[in-house]
Amino acid sequence: MKIEAVIFDWAGTTVDYGCFAPLEVFMEIFHKRGVAITAEEARKPMGLLKIDHVRALTEMPRIASEWNRVFRQLPTEADIQEMYEEFEEILFAILPRYASPINGVKEVIASLRERGIKIGSTTGYTREMMDIVAKEAALQGYKPDFLVTPDDVPAGRPYPWMCYKNAMELGVYPMNHMIKVGDTVSDMKEGRNAGMWTVGVILGSSELGLTEEEVENMDSVELREKIEVVRNRFVENGAHFTIETMQELESVMEHIEKQELIIS
């Protein structure tokens, strides 16, 4: 079997180490309404279409209970729409600062292309958001062959439609000749639902939620424990393989090809 294409996520996988751009904004739009949410809660739905992310936060029992305490009712769809509009406005202003390629990504992409591998991408950002991120990332040397946003298909993650559209545009089939790489639970589900080899990247991921400085300065035992928690979470949600950094991706690809593995 030959791997012919790799489909990458964006924030937390190829750009924006730790996926911090949306995090503070999600927390802020709730805080403004007197409803405090934690960073851990804000990260949990990461990877979904952003309005679905806001909706998922309002459906978390603790957050819903706190909202009910403040407003004497549960969040309505109008509340969700209002918060999402605020989210977009704030995020658009800061996105250019969070589009730098993660260290090692450009080199891995160049190596994959030398092998004739096509590079696709999916995201939880809207097309308008990605117009900002993709433009800035390209200026810094990262530009996949194709990009699909949830706006381009009937539904975003965990549905497989973005991966299918990548496959069609890149001209690659069957789906087990492709690898999906991401940093969230929804990425793992997207890849598995699409019938692709699915790989979770840990360092720089939203699931780990650490800055580069925090990773460098953290006690090695504590860091290892956190890495293993994320690794297990990825596997429990469908990852065939996990890697700590993007530099390990090619060895995973070679393993798949040499072993003639079958997706299960």
Swiss-Prot record:
GO terms for molecular function: magnesium ion binding; phosphoglycolate phosphatase activity; phosphonoacetaldehyde hydrolase activity. Pfam families: Hydrolase. The active site is at 9 (nucleophile), 50 (schiff-base intermediate with substrate). Keywords: Hydrolase, Magnesium, Metal-binding, Schiff base. GO terms for cellular component: cytosol. Mg(2+) binds at residues 9, 11, 183. It catalyses: phosphonoacetaldehyde + H2O = acetaldehyde + phosphate + H(+). The keyword Metal-binding applies. Involved in phosphonate degradation. This is Phosphonoacetaldehyde hydrolase.
